[in-house]
UniProtKB/Swiss-Prot annotation:
Name of the molecule in the record: NAD(P)H-quinone oxidoreductase subunit 6, chloroplastic
Its membrane topology: Multi-pass membrane protein
Transmembrane parts of this sequence: 10-30, 32-52, 61-81, 92-112, 152-172
Family named by the database record: Belongs to the complex I subunit 6 family.
Annotated keywords: Chloroplast, Membrane, NAD, NADP, Plastid, Plastoquinone, Quinone, Thylakoid, Translocase, Transmembrane, Transmembrane helix, Transport
Gene name of the record: ndhG
Organism in which the protein naturally occurs: Lobularia maritima (Sweet alyssum)
GO molecular function terms attached to this record: NADH dehydrogenase (ubiquinone) activity; quinone binding
Amino acid sequence: MDLPGPIHDFLLVFLGSGLLVGGLGVVLLPNPIFSAFSLGFVLVCISLLYILSNSHFVAAAQLLIYVGAINVLIIFAVMFMNDSEYSTDFNLWTVGDGITSLVCTTILFSLISTILDTSWYGVIWTTRLNQLLEQDLISNSQQIGIHLSTDFFLPFELISIILLVALVGAISVARQ
């Protein structure tokens, strides 16, 4: 999306804040319905970030697959659960929550320090990609495949990790 710098920066900060608030809602809300809606909000913010970075196909796939199908499936499964156990006796902080938050915070800071200490200028991107895309012999679906396996490989993998975490969380909530 071709926006002026300040508007682009504002939208980036706004969507990033939405991601943080939604992620905290997924983790901290005691009611699984509210947590599932918060997950839907996070997935919509991710698709809007893809629109902001001019990858409209990935944004549409994000909305259709994750928000439209997976999140609706999670909400549908949570609706069948007995919700009386969530409305009574809610402890805000337990020992297991403290240990988990300590481990997650340690992993977060180690990832941040690794990202900041890595020289990203030495990463060599493929030069053959531009030559392949300039040819008219490649169809649109092949171009999408090339972009997903080169330019958008990291966001594509991050989406799959988010889906895996969401499904594991939904299964663990359903088993309780």
